[in-house]
Amino acid sequence: MGWDLTVKMLAGNEFQVSLSSSMSVSELKAQITQKIGVHAFQQRLAVHPSGVALQDRVPLASQGLGPGSTVLLVVDKCDEPLSILVRNNKGRSSTYEVRLTQTVAHLKQQVSGLEGVQDDLFWLTFEGKPLEDQLPLGEYGLKPLSTVFMNLRLRGGGTEPGGRS
């Protein structure tokens, strides 16, 4: 069954999102991203008025939300730079200052400049997952001193994980 949830921001503005009881916080955050353009990793949600933080991957109904409910949205600007490590194919790690709102493509440009390898000749992975150029770094849960791996593309038409050439 579908219902509307009120999302209230600290500045006082409110908006509605359509949900179902089986939806999780991750799905709610995706709806909020579509509505106001704030990435999911920047969203902190809490039940109004209790202030209890919502748990990711838990159905909204299990957290006491239903028709007529309101959640508070706090947006983390993620302005502070953080240092991460990028390990190249020779096993050497270099430190990079990044912001979580930067895209993977921006980090690849930085790595390309330092490593002397064109950015279309490598891809980056974190915790075994390939990083998508168009996504912000914050979508991957990077923390200070996280290690990202640089993977060189093989000559001769090899493909990277995900089937891209």
Swiss-Prot record:
Residue span(s) of domain Ubiquitin-like: 2-78, 79-157
Modification after translation (UniProt): S-nitrosylation decreases its dimerization, thereby increasing the availability as well as the solubility of monomeric ISG15 for its conjugation to cellular proteins.
CDD domains the UniProt entry points to: Ubl1_ISG15, Ubl2_ISG15
Positions where S-nitrosocysteine occurs in the chain: C78
Induction of expression: Strongly induced upon exposure to type I interferons, viruses, LPS, and other stresses, including certain genotoxic stresses.
Documented effect of changing Y96L: Reduces ISG15 signaling. Strongly reduces ISG15 signaling and abolishes interaction with ITGAL and activation of SRC family tyrosine kinases
Keyword Disulfide bond: yes
Primary location group: cytoplasm
Keywords: Antiviral defense, Cytoplasm, Disulfide bond, Host-virus interaction, Immunity, Innate immunity, Isopeptide bond, Repeat, S-nitrosylation, Secreted, Ubl conjugation pathway
Impact when changing Q102D: Reduces ISG15 signaling. Strongly reduces ISG15 signaling and abolishes interaction with ITGAL and activation of SRC family tyrosine kinases
Any Gene Ontology biological process: response to type I interferon
Residue ranges, annotated region (Involved in the ligation of specific target proteins): 153-157
Short sequence motif named LRLRGG, residue ranges: 152-157
Subcellular location(s) per record: Cytoplasm; Secreted
Tissue-level expression: Detected in lymphoid cells, striated and smooth muscle, several epithelia and neurons. Expressed in neutrophils, monocytes and lymphocytes. Enhanced expression seen in pancreatic adenocarcinoma, endometrial cancer, and bladder cancer, as compared to non-cancerous tissue. In bladder cancer, the increase in expression exhibits a striking positive correlation with more advanced stages of the disease.
Disease: Immunodeficiency 38, with basal ganglia calcification: A primary immunodeficiency predisposing individuals to severe clinical disease upon infection with weakly virulent mycobacteria, including Mycobacterium bovis Bacille Calmette-Guerin (BCG) vaccines. Patients are also susceptible to Salmonella and Mycobacterium tuberculosis infections. Affected individuals have intracranial calcification.
Free-text comment about domains: Both the Ubiquitin-like 1 and Ubiquitin-like 2 domains are required for its efficient conjugation to cellular proteins. The two domains play different roles in the ISGylation pathway: Ubiquitin-like 2 domain is necessary for the first two steps allowing the linking of ISG15 to the E1 and E2 enzymes while Ubiquitin-like 1 domain is essential for the final, E3-mediated transfer of ISG15, from the E2 to the Lys of the target protein.
Protein name per the record: Ubiquitin-like protein ISG15
Gene: ISG15
